[in-house]
Amino acid sequence: MAAADALANVRNIGIMAHIDAGKTTTTERILFYTGITYKIGEVHEGAAVMDWMAQEQERGITITSAATKCEWKGHTIQIIDTPGHVDFTVEVERSLRVLDGAVAVYDGVAGVEPQTENVWRQADKYNVPRMCFVNKLDRTGADFFRCVQMMVDRLNATPLVLQVPIGLESEHIGVVDLIGMRALTWRGETQKGEDYAVEEIPAELADVATEWREKLMETLADVDDAVMEKYLEGEEFSVEEIKAAIRRATIAGKANPVLCGSAFKNKGVQPMLDAVVDYLPSPLDVPAIEGTATDGETPMLRKPSTSEPFAGLAFKIQTDKHLGKLTYVRVYSGVVETGSQVVNSTKDRKERIGKIYQMHANKREERGSAKAGDIIAVQGLKQTTTGDTLCDPANPVILESMTFPEPVIEVAIEPKTKADQEKLSTAIQRLAEEDPTFRVKLDEETGQTVISGMGELHLDILVDRMRREFNVEANIGMPQVAYRETIRRKVEKVEYTHKKQTGGSGQYARVIISLEPLPLDNEAPTYEFANAVTGGRIPREFIPSVDAGAQDAMQYGILAGFPLVGVKLTLVDGQYHEVDSSEMAFKIAGSMVLKDAARKADPALLEPMMAVEVTTPEENMGDVIGDINSRRGIIQAMEERGGARVVRSLVPLSEMFGYVGDLRSKTQGRASFSMQFDSYAEVPASVAREIIAKATGE
């Protein structure tokens, strides 16, 4: 019983938001109030505890999701502070995969911003219950109620407003608690806000408080039958009943509690911590994690209990200067101890648990074991990468992995000296282990190493880390768009025979395949292989070689040397020779037949399309729209936001280089924009011809 009690008091949460909404500042305040830090670290001073990489402290943004643990009112809160910059979506994606709940932080002036929408959708995908904290209410132009309305309009959320602000901008002194119908105020700038006063609601806010309290009860009645019954009969609710109903609605994903304050001015943070404990789920409140047996088909469940067999998911790899490779693991069930042997069921490899650490941003404490509900870092895992399942060898299970987006931008990188060449390969290997959206390939024609990622900032930081952490000095080329190739129609029964007779044993492999296009959405796989060979026409041991050969050929495409995506290859038939057939022969045949089939399947070029959002004064609207149209952009929506106009569009990434400067000069520096990857789309024929000619040197 004690173990279940302990688990009921655990909250695994993420703090997520758009860049600059004040996420890291909020986390720093949480650590201060829960007693982990004795001095508050400020982001703008480069001293935030959670931003521990050198680049984060210089740039004032969060890049990696730092994990830390704190105690509040008898509960253990494990927090993952995630980056808000779109180039680092992979960090957000993997955090959400292993969290039980989240706090979305909003800028009270800007409201719901593009990256907020993005993260909200990622959280929807993993069914993560979440609450909202409207921050920065001390800033000029802050508007709490507009922010709440944007949650409804843009996130399709059902906000449960639990607080309304007392005063805004420089007048902001506290909040009205709509459940207890009382005022909480933080007066005096000098204190760190540890103490707040509980007072009567100010007379001028009495009507607003009554109105929003009524709205809160109406919304609760809409999403909770027990409340509805009592509400219709006009009965009074106790504070406990209201809190229990909010908790039920939040955990079921039906509604989102909304609180407010100003983390930087130390206002509203403690009630937010109370809400994390009161409304976000413990590991016992979320459904048992689903997985499959090692056959990849039979469904299996793992309940969050220490009596179940051990199962955990590796969600992040980090290289530590002193400890080497650390693997972050969310333990879903059972117990795991230092030195125990586990199996990586995703790769079917045995692993030994070296040391187990409880991480606190970049400090750590060693532990002898970890149990269901824990988020830990493990030393000593050799073959485990992001998304792999670790489990008890006697009870294997494979948990659902994660899907990561394709990179959209690439640069060539050349080491300056021979010594740098060796360091570069080590650096690239380490960084690729840590970050699944960072890809590397060798350009066969130029002999250059080409690295690709999610945006210019992403690649900037990776190159910067190579310099700082691995002492690699390298020349970096101009950023290039990461085009892709695909096919538009299905071709059947394409065959290729690989035959070589040169004295002694020869080589022989014959394969027949069909090739068809797969849907090109971000959730779909970019390649599928199916084996439909019957009657032992190709021995089983050669089948993976055909697959491997085809995948090799896909890396270099057929039109212009860009990777081929969105294809399903079915191996239909073939033939082998008792003596002359080998894995190599079938690999070559797989590679050649893929190229032949793709050429016949109406190949096309794809380019990354970016969702671009421009915020501009009314008088510059015409220029902004004209400019987007001239970049082959498609306008999708226009709206008004806080006195400015917002234009949302889809624009090819290739047309967005240098946009910052152009927008600045067209609007005298008054407009701003953000962009994030949306999808891959077919390149118009005239543009495609130019790209292919340039790539093939014709």
UniProtKB/Swiss-Prot annotation:
Record-level Gene Ontology MF annotations: GTP binding; GTPase activity; translation elongation factor activity
Pfam family, one: EFG_C
Disulphide-bonded residues: none
UniProt keywords, alphabetically: Cytoplasm, Elongation factor, GTP-binding, Nucleotide-binding, Protein biosynthesis
tr-type G domain segment(s): 8-284
Binding site for GTP: 17-24, 81-85, 135-138
Keyword Nucleotide-binding attributed: yes
Family: Belongs to the TRAFAC class translation factor GTPase superfamily. Classic translation factor GTPase family. EF-G/EF-2 subfamily.
HAMAP family in alphabetical order: EF_G_EF_2_B (MF_00054_B)
Name of the protein in its database record: Elongation factor G
Gene label: fusA
